[in-house]
Amino acid sequence: MSNLQTIIEDAFERRAEITPSTASAEIKDAVFSVLADLDSGKLRVAERTDGQNWVTHQWIKKAVLLSFRLEDNVLLDDGVTKYFDKVPPKFANYTEADFKAGGFRVVPNAIVRRGSFIAKNAVLMPSYVNIGAYVGEGTMVDTWATVGSCAQIGKNVHLSGGVGIGGVLEPVQAGPTIIGDNCFIGARSEVVEGVIVEDNCVISMGVYIGQSTKIYDRETGEIHYGRVPTGSVVVSGNLPSKDGSYSLYCAVIVKKVDEKTLGKVGINELLRGI
């Protein structure tokens, strides 16, 4: 355990007594150091260990939570309107040189909070990226899409218009929502509650997946919870009750594709003839 982690863990146990005026310089320096490293991509709330397995660094989430106890709300002015919050925008002090060095594109009305990371060649349409989130290289966050606190978005992902990727700060032991590399998330879909969508998946428009959502594989009859397997093409559907008197919403895996097929075949073509 690093010295930084030790300071954060100890402070979190005493978080109820911590305020901007009572917190020690050591605690403030540790928390703000973590936020700076999240902002630069040096630290991530969750990291891939191997294959489709991830490890969550809960102490980093604790640092994010502690940051809310260390700062008072202040007046924020973007030149158009004013806000009153504890977390400043990521780009508040960016220069043209900073944006060029970052290598990403930010369209007007995109909002990104400090403590989140945007990788090179990412494109942010008018969207919202919350504190602790990670947006991977070459990813498109489309109009009105939301990337929640600590959510992890992989490389070459397309989050379509109005998509919601849920944030998970509390409970602390919960893992963040994760979207793997090369995924397409269709318009107005929601992936929340720490669900993991593995690499090369296609989620159709209007699919809602939380930890309690049944993810039904129609080829095998298997039901998954909390994780969409690699290469799944998923649409919304229903499963009947045992007595057939009603049905309940589920997500249905209608087919599987590999990365090569995904790269060659258009998304609409994959979703036709299902």
Curated annotation (Swiss-Prot):
What reaction does this catalyse?
A: (S)-2,3,4,5-tetrahydrodipicolinate + succinyl-CoA + H2O = (S)-2-succinylamino-6-oxoheptanedioate + CoA
The record's listing under InterPro entries reads:
DapD_Trfase_Hexpep_rpt_fam, Hexapep, Hexapep_transf_CS, THP_succinylTrfase_dom1, THP_succinylTrfase_N_sf, Trimer_LpxA-like_sf
Gene3D superfamilies documented for this protein? Hexapeptide repeat proteins (2.160.10.10), Tetrahydrodipicolinate-N-succinyltransferase, N-terminal domain (1.10.166.10)
Q: Where in the cell is it found?
A: Cytoplasm
Q: Pathway of this protein?
A: Amino-acid biosynthesis; L-lysine biosynthesis via DAP pathway; LL-2,6-diaminopimelate from (S)-tetrahydrodipicolinate (succinylase route): step 1/3
The UniProt annotation places substrate binding at R105, D142
Q: May I ask which residue range the UniProt record assigns to the signal sequence?
A: none
> For this protein, what is any one GO molecular function term?
nucleotidyltransferase activity
> Where is this protein chiefly located?
cytoplasm
Q: Name one GO cellular component term.
A: cytoplasm
UniProt record, GO biological process: diaminopimelate biosynthetic process; lysine biosynthetic process via diaminopimelate
Q: Which domain of life is it from?
A: Bacteria
Keyword field = Acyltransferase, Amino-acid biosynthesis, Cytoplasm, Diaminopimelate biosynthesis, Lysine biosynthesis, Repeat, Transferase
Top EC class per UniProt?
A: transferase
The catalytic activity of this protein is classed by the Enzyme Commission as: 2.3.1.117
UniProt subunit comment? Homotrimer.
Against NCBIfam families, the record matches this protein to: dapD, PRK11830.1
- State the family named in the UniProt similarity comment for this chain: Belongs to the transferase hexapeptide repeat family.
Q: What is this protein called?
A: 2,3,4,5-tetrahydropyridine-2,6-dicarboxylate N-succinyltransferase
| Organism annotation | Methylobacillus flagellatus (strain ATCC 51484 / DSM 6875 / VKM B-1610 / KT)
